[in-house]
Structures are given as structure tokens and as C-alpha cells.
């Protein structure tokens, strides 16, 4: 898969991934009503970056930027949309390692931001932290099947 696509396209083209997502999002263990709502209303998109070498952040950033532009252009009703970014999982899944992994991921992704703003781990740990790319605010959530928590 080269670009982000709607969850309905995932159903047609990658039924295994669709079933994995459906199983996760409809599970009683998954408490995110927003994600479930996005999934059922067909407002969910997926970008499969699992084949990218060593986290090609520029490609991921470009897809997120394109997704944001697409939603702004076609979202006349001000609905909320979700994009799931599928990446290769880290080798280790301890809580501390995953925390460092997601911090590093966000910091490196932010390096491509057109605003030239930078973030640090200390910024991310602040109560009022908001992650943004090109002045658009994103709510990143890490899903890791091997982690003890379903949503983080």
C-alpha cells in the first residue's frame, strides 16, 4: 500500500489487516469510543508504513500532511477522522522502552514540520502538551499488541 486509504479499501485489499483492526476496535478491552465511532462511520483511514526501512519519517510525515489536506478539502461537516499508521513494532515491549520509542518517533516526525518547531521529551511530558504537524493538532495513540495495556 503506497498511500493512506479508507478502511473500506483495507477491507477489499487487505482483509487480514482489516480483521485485526476490527477485532481490536470492537473488543470490550478497547475503551476508545472515538476510534470505534470512526471505524463504524467509515471515517477511519490507514497508512501501512510497516515496509518502510528504518522509519522513513519523511514519507510518514508526507502521508500525514496529505491526509490532513484531504480531510480539510472534503470534510465539510466537521466530522472527526482517524488515521491509523501501521509501523513495524519495536523489538522490545517493556513499558519504559515503548515510552522512549514513542517519544523518539514523535520527536523525529516533528523534525519535518513546516513550522520548524521542535519538541523534546520534557515537552511531551507536560500536562498541556499538544502534538502538531504544520499547525494541525494530532492525538497520537500507540497500539502495541504485545504491551500489557491495550491502548498504550
Model regions: which residues?
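Non-catalytic accessory regions used for complex assembly or targeting
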Residues: 1-76, 88-90, 100-116
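Aromatic/basic-lined ligand-recognition segments
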Residues: 119-152
Amino acid at each position: 500500500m503506497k498511500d493512506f486509504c479508507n478502511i473500506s479499501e483495507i477491507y477489499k485489499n487487505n482483509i487480514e489487516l482489516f480483521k485485526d483492526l476490527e477485532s481490536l476496535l470492537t473488543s470490550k478491552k478497547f475503551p476508545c469510543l472515538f476510534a470505534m465511532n470512526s471505524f463504524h462511520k467509515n471515517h477511519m483511514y490507514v497508512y501501512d508504513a510497516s515496509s518502510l526501512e528504518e522509519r522513513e519519517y519523511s514519507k510518514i510525515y508526507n502521508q500525514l500532511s496529505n491526509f490532513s489536506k484531504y480531510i480539510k478539502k472534503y470534510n465539510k461537516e466537521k466530522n472527526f477522522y482517524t488515521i491509523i499508521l501501521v509501523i513495524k513494532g519495536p523489538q522490545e515491549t517493556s513499558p519504559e522502552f515503548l515510552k522512549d520509542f514513542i517519544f523518539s518517533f514523535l520527536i523525529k516526525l516533528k523534525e519535518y514540520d513546516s513550522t520548524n518547531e521542535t519538541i523534546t521529551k520534557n515537552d511531551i511530558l507536560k500536562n498541556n502538551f499538544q502534538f502538531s504537524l504544520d499547525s494541525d493538532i494530532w492525538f497520537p495513540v500507540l497500539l502495541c499488541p504485545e504491551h500489557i495495556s491495550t491502548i498504550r
